[in-house]
């Protein structure tokens, strides 16, 4: 995760950062990349990444493009105790302001790696679950730890190259009367992580 270096706030706040400064709302809005900053802005040192390991759950993100989805998935991982995310190199940047904002601080507690996925997962002897429209209904899956959960691109799903490594295709059943085409990838992640 990340370690706080400086916290700027338009209100009094407790901080574990080395430095804390109270600033005006106007000053905060001038330095923030967001139209409506929430009153706090943090500056973090990016620590050297530890080595990715597969001793517990790892979430793999295959080509996600929406920074809000990435930030939400980081927050979900934090909520459900998943500490590592492996992103394909074409996944949106984790430090995109919208991704950072959507993570709501969870980015400081989750390790996010950007590397080629296949070299990491080929030859692993653990379950690799992938989200598909035509998979086994999630409520029928007996998830085993450690394991990998692959979530695909918003428009195209999991790439054909990664699909070959999936040992269990999983799906989230819709209500019979539903006319929705699919779930947003972050919404799907919430359902899968809960199971």
Model regions and ranges:
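RNA substrate-binding interface of SAM-dependent RNA methyltransferases
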Residues: 1-2, 51-135
């Amino acid at each position: 995760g990340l370690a706080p270096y400086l916290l700027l706030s338009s209100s009094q706040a407790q901080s574990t950062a080395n430095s804390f400064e109270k600033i005006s709302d106007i000053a905060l809005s001038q330095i923030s990349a967001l139209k409506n900053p929430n009153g706090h802005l943090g500056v973090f040192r990016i620590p050297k990444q530890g080595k990715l390991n597969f001793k517990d759950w790892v979430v793999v993100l295959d080509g996600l493009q929406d920074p809000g989805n990435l930030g939400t998935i980081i927050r979900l991982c934090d909520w459900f105790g998943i500490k590592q995310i492996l992103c394909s190199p074409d996944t949106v940047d984790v430090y995109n302001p919208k991704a950072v904002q959507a993570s709501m601080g969870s980015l400081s507690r989750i390790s996010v790696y950007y590397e080629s996925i296949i070299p990491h997962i080929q030859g692993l002897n653990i379950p690799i679950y992938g989200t598909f429209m035509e998979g086994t209904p999630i409520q029928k899956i007996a998830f085993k730890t450690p394991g990998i959960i692959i979530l695909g691109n918003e428009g195209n799903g999991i790439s054909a190259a990664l699909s070959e490594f999936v040992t269990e295709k999983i799906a989230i059943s819709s209500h019979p009367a539903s006319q929705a085409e699919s779930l947003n990838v972050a919404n799907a992640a919430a359902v899968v992580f809960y199971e």
